[in-house]
Amino acid sequence: MTILLALDPGNTESAWLLYDTATGRPTSWAKEPNPFVLTRLDTITADELVIEMVASYGMAVGAEIFDTCVWIGRFIERWHGPYRLIYRPDVKLHLTQTRRAKDANIRQALIDRYGPGKAVAIGLKATPGPLYGLTGDCWSALAVAVTAADAA
């Protein structure tokens, strides 16, 4: 059994998700301020860190992207185990078979993977599915985890 810690990094906050490769399911997740995520790396139990990596797409970038890159470096430095950098176009291609996919397409591909449909994949409070409670950037962290797990 391998546990992946997947990160969708940001310039001030990052989403993290623990993913059990034996069951193919996320076990816990949150979006927290980067300093909290950094200290969490000292206590969280996982076999490998997988991080969505920033890449150049030929467009001008601002300070937020550079700040995110700094945080990625800090996360890697703090983590004392194996890690992989996963690029967003690779996630898109793996989950949707096109690099032109948007976040909504990736989310739907994940729902289809855990479904069929939202009722099974996400569920309701009374009947939660494996993705119940997953919100916002945690979906991106799940996409990174699934892509990394399938590539292993």
Go through each PLM region and give its residues.
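Phosphate- and other anionic-substrate recognition elements at nucleic-acid/protein interfaces
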Residues: 1-152
